[in-house]
Amino acid sequence: MRCFERYRVHLNRLSLSNAVMRMVSGYAPSVVGAMGWSIFSSGPAAAQSAGGGTDPATMVNNICTFILGPFGQSLAVLGIVAIGISWMFGRASLGLVAGVVGGIVIMFGASFLGKTLTGGG
């Protein structure tokens, strides 16, 4: 154990606190700036009115309208294009085709099935 004595670092309490203060003082301007920015530029969240109101059914309806609208149609077209390119290069498999076509059927068929089962228009 005596061989480890010469490698032992003797830190007193004052030098340890000085080292910590030197390390922390480097971050002080950033912390103060971040606190000031968050206090003085606070405002209402931009996502608080994304649901279109307080009704959860309205929020779900807005999401369904987004997915089944032009965005969903673009995704379906891109999926079919990806299958065509994969088929052209010989990389298409039955699993890939079934996954993409099945996803398209589920995405657009769920709305029709839900309206049929609930009696909606």
UniProtKB/Swiss-Prot annotation:
Protein keywords: Cell outer membrane, Crown gall tumor, Membrane, Plasmid, Signal, Transmembrane, Transmembrane helix
Membrane topology, from the record: Multi-pass membrane protein
TM region positions: 65-85, 94-114
Extent of the signal sequence: 1-19
Subunit and interaction comment: Interacts with host plant RTNLB1 protein.
Subcellular location: Cell outer membrane
GO biological process: protein secretion by the type IV secretion system
Entry keyword Zinc-finger: no
Listed InterPro entries: TrbC/VirB2 (IPR007039)
Similarity comment: Belongs to the virB2 family.
Protein name: Protein virB2
NCBIfam families recorded: PRK13857.1
Organism annotation: Agrobacterium fabrum (strain C58 / ATCC 33970) (Agrobacterium tumefaciens (strain C58))
Purpose of the protein: VirB proteins are suggested to act at the bacterial surface and there play an important role in directing T-DNA transfer to plant cells.
Cellular component GO terms, alphabetical: cell outer membrane; type IV secretion system complex
Gene: virB2
